[in-house]
Amino acid sequence: MKKVLYVAAIAAALAVGGGVYLSSGATAAPASTFVLLDGSKKSTEDLKGQVTLVNFWATSCVTCVAEMPQIAATHEKYKSRGYNTLAVAMSYDPPSYVVNFAETRKLPFSVAIDNTGAVAQAWGDVKLTPTTYLVNKRGEIVKRYVGEPDFAELHRLIEKLLAQA
C-alpha cells in the first residue's frame, strides 16, 4: 500500500509540475508607467514591437549588482535587432544611489525608479531581487526569472523571440 501511495504521490507531483510548465504560456505584461531617471515616462504599451527584458533590482542586492554587466552585455549584443532592456529600481532603493550606479557603470539601457512600489506590485508583487521578465514583441511575458538568469538559456530565448514576426 505504501508503494502505491508513493507512486501516486510522484505521479501527482509530475502532473502538477508538467501542468505548470505547459500552462506557463505568455500573459500580457501589466499596464504600468515607468518613470525613468531623466524624468521621462515609458508605458508597458511602449514595450510592444520589441523584445524587452524588464529587470527589478536594487543597488543593495549583491546578485543584482553582480549580474548587471551580463545584462548590459546582453543589451549591447541584441539592441540592433529590436531588443531593449528596462531596469526598474525597487521603491526602497534611494534614488541618489540608483542614479550614481547607473552613471558610474554607464548602463546602456533605460533605468526607472519605482518610487511608490506600484510597478513591482503590478508585475506580480515583486519582492525578491533580482526578478526579471522577458517580454515578447506583442507585450506578453514569456519568462520570469527570480535570481540571476542562466544567460546562455536567456540568449537562446531572446534569439527565438527576435526571430518571431
Regions found by a protein language model. Name each.
Residues 51-52, 83, 130:
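Alpha/beta-hydrolase fold active-site loops
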Residues 53-55, 87-89, 133-134:
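Hydrophobic beta-strand core positions in alpha/beta domains
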Residues 100-108, 115-160:
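Thiol/disulfide oxidoreductase modules built on the thioredoxin-like
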Residues 48-49, 80, 108:
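Active-site acidic short loop of glycosyltransferases
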Residues 37, 47, 137:
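Short, ordered coil/turn segments that flank beta-strands lining enzyme active or ligand-binding pockets
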Residues 65-105, 115-121:
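Structural microenvironment flanking redox-active thiols in thiol-disulfide oxidoreductases
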